[in-house]
Amino acid sequence: RYVPKIRQLMKKIVFCLLLLTFSFRLAAQIDYLEPVKPFSSYTGELGEYYRSVFSLLNTGFQKQPYARFAAIPSFSPEYAMSVERKNGRYTLISNTLSRTYWQAEKGTVTVDTKSVVISASLYQSLGAIFRLVTEQVQDLDGSTAGLDGIVYYFSSTDAKGKERMGRKWSPEKGTLMER
């Protein structure tokens, strides 16, 4: 009963990822991912937010990402997707928070998890795309994400087992930062 809805959601997520990945050069912003500081380096409320929200978003995901994506919108619930191989099966797993974590009281946010089995070729293709994107993480201009919009986080693990993570900020349409 839920399989068609899950597949439709997963297809939308994959399509958005591919579109976002290939549109980096088309945007008037930087065309590479920026490095991500370790979440443990943030202090105070922001540090607590990052550690808590990523802990929730990674619920049920493998410790080391093959290909993982997380989105942190300013005013709507955070969500993540992981491409994984478990028990010989290839799956896309998505986690969506029940509400925006930043505005919620502690302990009130739950995780809605959905998963779908994918083909080995899609698994390998998504892994290749994520590795290509995360290998190009640069900090050339020291720019940083703004306050409004969505920050997208991409992570993957290379053949040597090294985890790479980068982020891309996408300002809200119609704002001065988007122009």
Give the positions of each predicted feature.
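Function-determining sites in protein domains
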Residues: 29-179
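Bacterial Sec-dependent N-terminal signal peptides
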Residues: 1-32
